[in-house]
Amino acid sequence: MTDTNLDFLAQTDPTLAAMIQGELQRQREHLELIASENFTSPAVLAAQGSVLTNKYAEGLPKKRYYGGCEWVDQAEQLAIDRAKELFGAAHANVQPHSGAQANFAVFLALLNPGDTIMGMDLSHGGHLTHGSPVNVSGKWFKVSHYGVSPDTERLDYDSILELAKKEKPKLLICGYSAYPRIIEFDKFRAIADEVGAYLMADIAHIAGLVASGHHPNPLPYCDVVTTTTHKTLRGPRGGLIMTNNPELGKQFDKAVFPGTQGGPLEQVIAAKAVAFGEALKPEFKVYSGQVIANAQALANQLNQRGFKLVSGGTDNHLMLVDLRCIDMTGKEADKLVSEINITANKNTVPFDPESPFVTSGLRLGSPAMTTRGLGVEEFREIGNIIADCLLNRNDEAVKKDCLNRVKALCDRFPLYPHLNIPVPVLA
């Protein structure tokens, strides 16, 4: 998305242009703490708004079912090569439209309906596509779920091994949507080998940390690795499948197309190439380190203010605040922080007595605001703002003060200052 594109949009569809401008203003004026969100570079936005959106390109580079693919072949191959270099993978498929699509392709390649899969329970930090009963993965396969220890709120690898011996899964899944600690992929490899299972790592949340060396890389241990390309990787919304096994790579390629998708989104693949290129630069390693430092600063500040953190803190980009310590639900906390222009999300905590629509937790993450330039001191201030807001839930004066402090931070660290749509925002 460039100024020129926005000008065209404002001229041809001012109604939609106003909506996009409204969303731009919302992003500028809020502290974005949703752990799965980030702000892409202008270059990523530009690639997604390019003429590549016009091209159909079923198949793989140099193996297409349509003519005229010489340039999209080069763009897609660039994305593949950069993904392989970034993660140290022998094979990469950059076509999945999303992380869920990447996971489904792996399931199609490795499993038959009725096979057993084993992943983390959603309420403990897993993901819908890892066997939740409301997801197709929970309908097509027999599912066994593991969770965290009730004592440490961390993975208990001995318990996972015992469950795997009992259930004998064909596919063991590690990688999560709300787990704040380091994942020991070597221990999962040993468990998978013990029971003869394939091992899949879904690193959608931690991909940027893995790519930059701030989290162990699963590729030496896992048969297949899937991820999204946004979140900590700071690219466009999309998916990616990687493996070091050439034969499995061929199966995954077929499972993506024609197995689960038709034509790839070449404009998004080009944006993935941009993001992978950015992540290969030294600046990205610095950024990822700051993401972790900022998350730990926020977690420590909340802990000092009396809040309980699931597992006691964080090793990565996210944390879970257990709000039962202040007799508050996640739904209530989500609403309160939204009123002071902080965007977060309610989230279940391990062994949560509340429903998923209410929850006892609040999930917070540092990637987006780290992209805007905030550092440790600013994240400590964010911790104090959140604490002041939640601990004084009925005090309007405190709420107003918190809102002003949020505004001050947003003003100090502007977002996309070059972008603007010359149309009024809709009421």
Curated annotation (Swiss-Prot):
Reactions it catalyzes: (6R)-5,10-methylene-5,6,7,8-tetrahydrofolate + glycine + H2O = (6S)-5,6,7,8-tetrahydrofolate + L-serine
Cofactor(s) of this protein: pyridoxal 5'-phosphate
Marked site: Plays an important role in substrate specificity: H230
Binding site for (6S)-5,6,7,8-tetrahydrofolate: L122, G126, H127, L128, E247, S355, P356, F357
Pathway(s) served: One-carbon metabolism; tetrahydrofolate interconversion; Amino-acid biosynthesis; glycine biosynthesis; glycine from L-serine: step 1/1
Any one GO cellular component localisation term in the record: cytosol
Gene3D superfamilies noted in UniProt: Aspartate Aminotransferase, domain 1 (3.90.1150.10), Type I PLP-dependent aspartate aminotransferase-like (Major domain) (3.40.640.10)
Family the UniProt entry places it in: Belongs to the SHMT family.
Name of this chain's protein: Serine hydroxymethyltransferase
